[in-house]
Curated annotation (Swiss-Prot):
Subcellular location: Cytoplasm
Boundaries of every PRC barrel domain copy: 97-170
GO molecular function, one term: ribosome binding
Gene3D superfamilies attached to this UniProt entry: PRC-barrel domain, RimM
Gene name, Swiss-Prot/TrEMBL: rimM
The protein's assembly and partners: Binds ribosomal protein uS19.
One GO biological process term: ribosomal small subunit biogenesis
Keyword Transferase carried by entry: no
Its biological purpose: An accessory protein needed during the final step in the assembly of 30S ribosomal subunit, possibly for assembly of the head region. Essential for efficient processing of 16S rRNA. May be needed both before and after RbfA during the maturation of 16S rRNA. It has affinity for free ribosomal 30S subunits but not for 70S ribosomes.
Species classification: Bacteria, Pseudomonadati, Pseudomonadota, Betaproteobacteria, Rhodocyclales
Organism: Dechloromonas aromatica (strain RCB)
NCBIfam families: 16S_RimM (TIGR02273)
Chief place where the protein resides: cytoplasm
GO cellular component: cytoplasm; ribosome
Family from the record: Belongs to the RimM family.
Stated name of the protein: Ribosome maturation factor RimM
Length: 170
């Protein structure tokens, strides 16, 4: 399975307890539904994806914790911190209108209402309140644009661009 076939769904975070559990930092809005996928794909950024069996997933407090096959204790869990979690696109539901997987936004050009190119989406950040587009300009300056309707006017995937209300000098 290549990186292009995998949609990144989240990232493993800190260990939870001493029996191999990890906090899951999801990039989506329904991580409990991931329990339906017995096989996850995991990788560190820039490394090849590999299969990993999910042993358990549960809500805990305001978050989600997971137990993966082969992660038996806290030491093993500590070594998994930062690992990306993904799934093959065909295993995921299709998105509704104005819903997007983050991976579909990465690489799109960002154009403002004055038809000025702000840059290219290189990643996203989840802040809790909303997602934030990481946009790298041609000047190698990274700009952070909130992914909210007041800023993002249209996502035109077929045209390869996102239209925004944002000044080129902001």
């Amino acid at each position: 399975m290549t990186g292009n076939d995998i949609v990144v769904l989240g990232r493993l975070a800190d260990p939870y307890g001493i029996q191999g559990w990890l906090w899951l930092y999801p990039f989506g809005d329904d991580p409990l539904a991931w329990a339906e996928m017995p096989v996850w794909w995991i990788a560190r950024e820039g490394e090849p994806w590999r299969e990993c069996r999910l042993k358990s997933l549960k809500a805990h407090g305001n978050g989600v914790v997971v137990l993966l096959d082969g992660v038996a204790d806290r030491t093993a869990a500590e070594s998994m911190k930062g690992v990306l979690v993904g799934a093959p696109r065909e295993a995921l539901p299709t998105t509704e209108k104005n819903e997007f997987y983050w991976t579909d936004l990465i690489g799109l050009d960002v154009i403002n209402t004055a038809d000025e190119r702000i840059g290219k989406v290189v990643g996203l950040i989840e802040t809790g309140a909303n997602s934030v587009l990481r946009v790298m300009g041609d000047d190698k300056v990274e700009r952070l644009l909130p992914f909210v309707s007041a800023v993002v006017l249209a996502v035109e995937k077929e045209a390869g661009q996102i239209r925004v209300e944002w000044g080129s000098d902001w």
